[in-house]
Curated annotation (Swiss-Prot):
Belongs to the ATP-dependent DNA ligase family. It comes from Methanothrix thermoacetophila (strain DSM 6194 / JCM 14653 / NBRC 101360 / PT). It is an enzyme of class 6 (ligase). Keywords: ATP-binding, Cell cycle, Cell division, DNA damage, DNA recombination, DNA repair, DNA replication, Ligase, Magnesium, Metal-binding, Nucleotide-binding. DNA ligase that seals nicks in double-stranded DNA during DNA replication, DNA recombination and DNA repair. The gene is lig. GO terms for biological process: cell division; DNA biosynthetic process; DNA recombination; DNA repair; lagging strand elongation. Its EC number is 6.5.1.1. It catalyses: ATP + (deoxyribonucleotide)n-3'-hydroxyl + 5'-phospho-(deoxyribonucleotide)m = (deoxyribonucleotide)n+m + AMP + diphosphate. This is DNA ligase.
Length: 552
């Protein structure tokens, strides 16, 4: 069993190391010494992932209440620490340093926290629901802070916020697993894309069984992604393509196991209970005994046209009153791929074969229409039809391409009328002036560096926010403020904005090296987590594409 103090010391050492290679070496050495049970947990913890695909549901106010109870400090004293540090981890560190003697014996008899203890406490927090769930979360956090040293408390708090702030992302953990257990980075990445669980990948790599990890029913896999197509004509340069509408909806991955149907969102979170009609559609219209299906759920109005994306998100977020909401925001299912059927993986089959299988097991009314053609004019016609129907554009897919989980490449291209929007994490905000003095009027945006997990800013957005939205957003972000500096505030990176813009420019003013010209808010993407924000690499690709440049 691994003491949590050892894990906290690892995080502290990594945070004080600047180079990615050095960080990889430190982490690889640590992972190689762990037993399998602890290894699986630590590989996730170091990225701020406690349970893959599951949010803990701990907000800043709940965290600070737990710290206050565990240390005996008043709420005002905890808030003063927050104003001074702007970091939940440092708040916990300093609060535990000042912990009142009475609280030290509150949970006597402990021999110190272990990684397994902390994991089980967070598991209880994640499972808490319904009446009394907030108190369950507070008490579990209170227990951990009562038992923790200042350094342990620092990283318990950051785990609770799912933000470790040590510069470790998926890429670095992948490389560390490969180095620790003598396997290739490519094999680690393949296994991760098939399981969405680097902890599980690390465990199997240690056992020398990495090749045993594959696609499995009821375990979501990363979805194949599309990149931006330069134009219809350029996209058809290599021959015939499979053309489908790009629906204005929400991506879903559906796992059917006989009569049991589970639905996963783009974030690979289980949303089955929120989408009962999709579950029933699959039960009634898919004949395969077991299957993993890829598709889009679209909210439709009385005229058959898609409703705004925010309406779809209302369905995905809904936990209570689902039946009532389903009547006002009905969903249609459009399936476009099948990647597993009756015990066999279809990942390595070409798209045209996967399509044949899909058509053989699903009824036509739930399958997205597809036309295979090399005729530019026919594709343009389908593109115009999609836009006229209220959808986003078209997808152009290579008929001979395999399904590559988690990959964005030229085998799937999306053609839309405007520059591709970006999904960016909000990391700060600025108070307004005059009549908007009590409202947060503009928001600082960041992309993610996948190698380090760090957020790199790309500018601010204020356009596209109505007065009504200002009030709602202010309430949303007020809870997430971690530090104030004059008119500006730093917020916990939890909310993702979909942002449009005129172009991407090079800029030395932001840590990303890029800036958005004339950004505007399109939507608050509640269906996406910060880890799913657009990457620094992708912003660079869009910059080169809009300039007609090729990567050097």
């Amino acid at each position: 069993m691994t003491g949590f103090a050892r894990f906290a010391e690892l995080c502290e050492r990594i945070s004080q190391t600047s180079g990615s290679l050095e960080k990889t070496d430190i982490l690889a050495s640590f992972l190689s010494d762990l037993e399998s049970d602890d290894l699986r947990i630590v590989a996730g913890f170091v990225m701020g992932v406690v349970i893959p695909g599951t949010e803990l549901g701990v907000g800043p106010s709940l965290l600070y209440e737990s710290i206050s109870r565990a240390t005996g400090l008043s709420s005002d004293a905890v808030n003063e620490l927050l104003r001074a540090t702007g970091d939940p981890g440092l708040v916990a560190y300093r609060a535990v340093e000042r912990r009142k003697p009475l609280t030290l014996a509150a949970f006597s008899g402990s021999e110190g926290l272990e990684v397994q203890d902390v994991y089980q406490r967070f598991l209880s927090i994640a499972k808490a629901s319904g009446r009394g769930s907030q108190e369950i979360r507070v008490k579990n956090l209170q227990y951990m802070f009562s038992e923790a040293s200042p350094l342990e408390a620092k990283y318990i708090a950051r785990l609770a916020m799912e933000d470790m702030r040590i510069g470790v992302g998926e890429g670095l953990v992948r490389d560390a697993i490969a180095k620790a257990f003598g396997v290739s980075k490519e094999d680690v990445e393949r296994a991760y894309n098939l399981t969405n669980d680097l902890g599980l990948v690390a465990e199997y790599a240690k056992l020398g069984r990495l090749n045993e990890l594959g696609i499995s029913i009821n375990r979501p896999i990363k979805m194949m992604l599309a990149q931006i197509g330069e134009s219809i004509e350029a996209s058809l340069a290599e021959g015939a393509t499979a053309v489908e509408w790009k629906f204005d909806g929400a991506r879903v991955q559906i796992h059917k196991d006989k009569g049991n149907v589970r639905i996963f969102s783009r974030r690979l979170e289980d949303v089955t209970s929120s989408l009962p009609e999709i579950r029933e559609i699959v039960r009634g219209h898919v004949r395969a005994r077991t299957a993993i299906l890829d598709g889009e759920a679209v909210a439709t109005g009385e005229d058959g046209r898609p409703l705004p994306f925010q309406e779809i998100l209302r369905r995905f977020r809904r936990k209570y009153g689902v039946a009532r909401t389903a009547k006002t925001i009905p969903l249609k299912l459009h399936l476009f791929d099948i990647i597993y059927m009756d015990g066999a993986s279809l990942l390595d089959e070409p798209l045209e074969e996967r399509r044949r299988v899909l058509v053989s097991v699903a009824d036509p009314e739930i399958i997205a229409e597809q036309v295979v053609t090399s005729d530019v004019h026919r594709v343009e016609e389908i593109y115009r039809e999609a836009l006229a129907a209220g959808h986003e554009g078209v997808m152009l897919k290579n008929p001979s391409s395999t399904y590559t989980p988690g990959k964005r490449g030229k085998n799937w291209l999306k053609i839309k009328p405007l520059l591709e929007s970006l999904d960016l994490v909000v990391i700060g905000a600025r108070w307004g002036e005059g009549k908007r003095a009590n409202l947060l009027g503009s928001y600082r945006l960041a992309c993610i560096d996948t190698d380090t997990g760090e957020l790199k800013d790309v500018g601010w957005v204020a356009t596209g926010i109505t007065d009504e939205m200002l009030a709602e957003l202010t309430e949303l972000f007020r809870e997430l403020i971690v530090k104030e500096n004059g008119m500006e505030v730093e917020v916990h990176p939890e909310i993702v904005f979909e942002v449009g813009y005129e172009e991407i420019q090079r800029s030395p003013n932001y840590s990303s090296g890029y800036a958005l010209r004339f950004p505007r808010l399109i939507a608050v993407r509640d269906d996406k987590s910060p880890s799913e924000a657009d990457t620094l690499e992708r912003i660079g690709e869009i910059y080169r594409l809009q300039r007609g440049r090729s990567k050097k």
